[in-house]
Amino acid sequence: MNQPESANDPEPLCAVCGQAHSLEENHFYSYPEEVDDDLICHICLQALLDPLDTPCGHTYCTLCLTNFLVEKDFCPMDRKPLVLQHCKKSSILVNKLLNKLLVTCPFREHCTQVLQRCDLEHHFQTSCKGASHYGLTKDRKRRSQDGCPDGCASLTATAPSPEVSAAATISLMTDEPGLDNPAYVSSAEDGQPAISPVDSGRSNRTRARPFERSTIRSRSFKKINRALSVLRRTKSGSAVANHADQGRENSENTTAPEVFPRLYHLIPDGEITSIKINRVDPSESLSIRLVGGSETPLVHIIIQHIYRDGVIARDGRLLPGDIILKVNGMDISNVPHNYAVRLLRQPCQVLWLTVMREQKFRSRNNGQAPDAYRPRDDSFHVILNKSSPEEQLGIKLVRKVDEPGVFIFNVLDGGVAYRHGQLEENDRVLAINGHDLRYGSPESAAHLIQASERRVHLVVSRQVRQRSPDIFQEAGWNSNGSWSPGPGERSNTPKPLHPTITCHEKVVNIQKDPGESLGMTVAGGASHREWDLPIYVISVEPGGVISRDGRIKTGDILLNVDGVELTEVSRSEAVALLKRTSSSIVLKALEVKEYEPQEDCSSPAALDSNHNMAPPSDWSPSWVMWLELPRCLYNCKDIVLRRNTAGSLGFCIVGGYEEYNGNKPFFIKSIVEGTPAYNDGRIRCGDILLAVNGRSTSGMIHACLARLLKELKGRITLTIVSWPGTFL
């Protein structure tokens, strides 16, 4: 009988506004005068609290807008596309106007005072008889802080509701503002992250006195516990996806295109993050394209494109350019392309991905994923000498979620650090040129390196490899929720071998009846889904003319039909030529054979390979197949860019001539949002840069091309060939 009564108990009074409301709601105030419409939030229809400005010119409460954008991706007023990271805190002037709004004391039976909104909390603590009557004075508040970290006069903590946004959860878990929006920087007055919508909605930014350090520390632990609770409830964003699915069911009769939540701001730049993807159908397509692999200068597996109707798009957290480091605990940070594809194609209802997003402001190096390590206390000194102040050291620096400091993510082949030979991946950088970085950031470390003239003095802590699996592997459960062998019961990830691809040209004369179909389906062609591809055979009909002949196979590239070249023609033109033939047809084709390395049939990799072999009807060309085509089949395009005001073209390149590895093409590894390359829209991750202003890049070393791109002014013409990534 007591439980229903306690469930109906009123919410505790808030020590900031004096009203009874839950932790997930904004403060309530009574305004004796009408508030100007420009100072009203058009989501809650109340005066603005902690206002955020959108790029389209509207202003909302931080808490209101954050919760709105969890399920939507547009501005509530004009429905223009909107993400939280593009919003900025309103100006100091707007905040001052809001703080000066007159409010009445809510305890009217004890106090009738009218005062400015920013003074109400101080009024409760010092001179309000009503606040003293209800226990909201300073002494009572201090005693109740352990029960209500946000200042509510309650002796019991209130758990956050499932509606708390995932963005708010991430904000509660860290005291470090994101790199994407410098406006979200916590101030000394706040004592907490400025981007935390729950806490910012629960406190006044202009309170007259700062918090005590012990109070801030206590609140931090409370925030972490609340954040973990919400993450368990939302199952890493699956609840959001379910809301989107329900919305689609309710809008089946509408003609508007489906819009999925844009939650990619939940993955921080420059940090290794694990996410959980749920699928009802274990074999449902991810609807993404992948490029990269250890056989290419890209090294990593990178998302090139995300289709709007797939699992990844519904999840909403990943972006093109994100690097996939692990798949269900299997390390793919340095494996061949097809090996990673096999792992990603393995059916599972729960897919764990460990990913990393490139930082917007970073040293332009590629990287590899660190393994699990056990730290040691010893350290050593490394002195690197640059040939010029502009030369890069050839290391990529990242932070870790579970450890403070700066870590080396990768040592780039051929760079200064690589030639020196002392630095290794996952080394912790303790200091640079005497500056302590034990609790520093990769950005500050990069700044110190760039500011060095010639000599860079690093203090580094070496760590030893720890033989331990991932958390979910150690627990003995696989991605389907069933028991799997422990680490001692099966071997570690084998080192995959690189496949070999050969091209063989052939001429085939086929006889058929005049009205008989050839029995094959072709794809590709000029402007084929934004990629200019050769015409290739995507399937052969069993029992048809081509199938009976047996010489033209799925995957063959058609070069010529009865003397007519098929290069640079559209698919419809190629189909018309194939249908025009009578009783005899001569096909010139390029047969592309891919030989996978022989593996032990009992190894996990071999089992995965056999399990995930796509049937012929589902065959699609892999990205590495396109790379092996002869140059005559390249459909190159010229892209003209102009530098922005910051002087950057906005893309990162890897590859080039190396003394020990020979000549390799230059690949586009990443593209920075808001730059000329990004705004042009035609450059993708995995594209090959063939020439700059007509000058071939073949045979260039990386430093030479980087210097050339940096020094060129005005119009810059890039000659690029773009191949579609492997579809999953």
Swiss-Prot record:
It catalyses: S-ubiquitinyl-[E2 ubiquitin-conjugating enzyme]-L-cysteine + [acceptor protein]-L-lysine = [E2 ubiquitin-conjugating enzyme]-L-cysteine + N(6)-ubiquitinyl-[acceptor protein]-L-lysine. Pfam families: PDZ (PF00595), zf-C3HC4 (PF00097). One of its GO terms (cellular component) is postsynapse. Expressed in heart, placenta, kidney, pancreas and brain. InterPro entries: PDZ, PDZ_scaffold, PDZ_sf, Znf_C3HC4_RING-type, Znf_RING, Znf_RING/FYVE/PHD, Znf_RING_CS. E3 ubiquitin-protein ligase that mediates ubiquitination and subsequent proteasomal degradation of NUMB. E3 ubiquitin ligases accept ubiquitin from an E2 ubiquitin-conjugating enzyme in the form of a thioester and then directly transfers the ubiquitin to targeted substrates. Mediates ubiquitination of isoform p66 and isoform p72 of NUMB, but not that of isoform p71 or isoform p65. Isoform 2 provides an endocytic scaffold for IGSF5/JAM4. Interacts with the phosphotyrosine interaction domain of all isoforms of NUMB. Interacts with MAGEB18 and MAGEF1. Interacts with the Coxsackievirus and adenovirus receptor CXADR. Interacts with endogenous retrovirus K protein Np9. IGSF5/JAM4 interacts with isoform 2 through the second PDZ domain, other isoforms may also interact with IGSF5/JAM4. This is E3 ubiquitin-protein ligase LNX.
